[in-house]
Amino acid sequence: MEPAFGEVNQLGGVFVNGRPLPNAIRLRIVELAQLGIRPCDISRQLRVSHGCVSKILARYNETGSILPGAIGGSKPRVTTPTVVKHIRTYKQRDPGIFAWEIRDRLLADGVCDKYNVPSVSSISRILRNKIGNLAQQGHYDSYKQHQPAPQPALPYNHIYSYPSPITAAAAKVPTPPGVPAIPGSVAMPRTWPSSHSVTDILGIRSITDQVSDSSPYHSPKVEEWSSLGRNNFPAAAPHAVNGLEKGALEQETKYSQAPNGLPAVGSFVSASSMAPYPTPAQVSPYMTYSAAPSGYVAGHGWQHAGSTPLSPHNCDIPASLAFKGMQAAREGSHSVTASAL
């Protein structure tokens, strides 16, 4: 009896994909083959595919059975709980044991015989999937027991906190107003309310505080400097300039000028005591000027009224002689009239 559902093959027969051919059709194929009918004729007569007929007849000739499936059944299961237990025991005693050594030991101890002993690949799979997880769990438990208690996680907020063993220094530094307090075990001592400065981020402030606390000399803290104002400094004396005595400044500002070849001036000369500069004589551009060497005046216009070119200071020669010498030099010069030119 053909099933009421399925697919139709190329010969018009109905079959169900994935299911074996019914036993009645299998038996009929074998009977027709024994009668001497060719497989191609059996396929057309029973409307079964040629491949299915050939396969059923080949299996019947080899095994004498028309039943589908594996002949003799599947291999019995060898990885029993007893075998797994012995494998775990071997692995715990010798963690570096190999799979083939476990297989030989199973045979030597009589746990398995040569027919049901697991293969090397099966033992490796058992070590990896079943025993490996248990061993890792045991190692993790033992490691967890030897580990110290974990430290609390670092809080993350707008105030950067760092793990620091300096708890004593943290107790000394007060918390600025308006800033939430941070636990001393995980926070560094903070003295500045700013949380975005380079020293706070790098932790330099706590190091400087530690050095200042450990040093024998007193170093002012930031709080002490912030409490100081300009009113705390003493006022300068009226006779002092920028906190310094005027006498000391006057002594420093008075200095002696280095000698430069000219005699030093001991006193200042008022403008009223100086004579005006002499007016030069007007000389025609068409006249030749010649004078004796004694007529030149080796002096300066800024010389004193009572001085001469020969002796600029403290000279006894009257000033009128210098002008007389210049007048004589002008008279002794050879002049040419404009009419001669």
Curated annotation (Swiss-Prot):
Statement: the UniProt record of this protein carries the keyword Transcription? yes
What is the protein's name according to its record? Paired box protein Pax-9
Relate the assembly described in the record. Interacts with KDM5B.
Lineage, top-rank taxon, reads Eukaryota
Query: Keywords of this protein's UniProt record, alphabetized?
Result: Developmental protein, DNA-binding, Nucleus, Paired box, Transcription, Transcription regulation
Summary of the function given for this chain in its UniProt record: Transcription factor required for normal development of thymus, parathyroid glands, ultimobranchial bodies, teeth, skeletal elements of skull and larynx as well as distal limbs.
- The residue ranges crossing the membrane are none
GO CC terms in record:
nucleus
User: What species does this protein belong to?
Assistant: Leontopithecus rosalia (Golden lion tamarin)
Q: Which residues form a coiled coil?
A: none
| InterPro entries for this protein | Homeodomain-like_sf, PAIRED_DNA-bd_dom, Paired_dom, PAX_fam, WH-like_DNA-bd_sf
Which CDD domains does this chain map to?
PAX (cd00131)
DNA-binding positions: 4-130
GO MF annotation list: DNA-binding transcription factor activity, RNA polymerase II-specific; RNA polymerase II cis-regulatory region sequence-specific DNA binding
